[in-house]
């Protein structure tokens, strides 16, 4: 489902000026002219998962979840999702957060523990599931909130060209809350890049 009211690059420039394009370039994000840019921040007072003329168009009125924001994107368009520092999101079911939009770039803002954090819990099959080609994921934290969570980020055979950079995948602070596999790549997921990622466990963890 693409957004009924997409916030395009032209809207971004009209609202924030051309300097915002320089900001995106500094993040290593190349935004095509026709792409949509969607903002996500669970901590914002006005955060709502709604496809209207306001939410997701700025950090003043962002979407509340990455999962919803993905559903607003268009396949093959080069859309970008920006996730605010301090964003938190819990993935709790076996029907995971699925990145099924090709040429999508997801960028977390912030540093250290302030980076967007995705907690996997309730079901050991909870995961961020990448199924589309040419997906980029940058600067997020994926943390186990349950014993023996199987996989942090699952890359399917259809997700050729995936790029995962500057991400942290880790146990949930104790050896009990173990993340068994940080990133799982299907054998047919060719042209994958995993760059500058941290895979962390605690004493007694796996």
Where is each model-derived feature located?
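Right-handed parallel beta-helix/beta-solenoid
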Residues: 2-68, 85
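Right-handed parallel beta-helix
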Residues: 136-206
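Intrinsically disordered, low-complexity regulatory segments
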Residues: 1-28, 131-132, 144-147, 159, ...
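Beta-strand-rich, repetitive solenoid scaffolds
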Residues: 6-9, 63, 71-72, 108, ...
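Right-handed parallel beta-helix/beta-spiral solenoid domain characteristic of secreted/periplasmic
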Residues: 90-91, 102-151, 172-174
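Short, T/G/N/S-enriched strand-turn elements that build extracellular solenoid repeat scaffolds
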Residues: 28-29, 51-52, 66-75, 89-101, ...
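Detector for repetitive beta-architecture
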Residues: 37, 78-80, 86-88, 96-98, ...
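Glycine-rich repeat segments that build the extracellular carbohydrate-interaction surface of secreted
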Residues: 38-44, 64-90, 104-110
């Amino acid at each position: 489902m693409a957004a009924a009211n997409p916030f395009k690059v032209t809207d971004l420039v009209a609202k924030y000026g051309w300097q915002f394009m320089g900001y995106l370039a500094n993040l290593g994000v190349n935004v095509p002219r026709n792409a949509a840019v969607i903002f996500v921040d669970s901590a914002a007072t006005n955060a709502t998962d709604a496809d209207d003329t306001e939410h997701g168009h700025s950090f003043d009125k962002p979407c509340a979840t990455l999962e919803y924001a993905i559903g607003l994107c268009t396949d093959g368009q080069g859309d970008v999702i920006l996730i605010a520092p301090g964003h938190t999101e819990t993935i709790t079911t076996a029907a995971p957060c699925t990145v099924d939009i090709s040429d999508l770039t997801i960028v977390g803002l912030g540093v250290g523990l302030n980076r967007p954090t995705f907690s996997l819990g309730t079901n050991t099959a909870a995961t961020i599931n990448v199924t589309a080609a040419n997906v980029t994921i940058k600067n997020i934290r994926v943390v186990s909130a349950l014993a023996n969570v199987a996989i942090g980020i699952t890359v399917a055979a259809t997700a050729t060209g995936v790029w995962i950079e500057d991400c942290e995948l880790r146990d949930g602070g104790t050896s009990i809350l173990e993340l068994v596999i940080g990133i799982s790549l299907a054998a047919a997921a060719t042209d994958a890049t995993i760059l500058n990622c941290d895979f962390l466990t605690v004493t007694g963890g796996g």
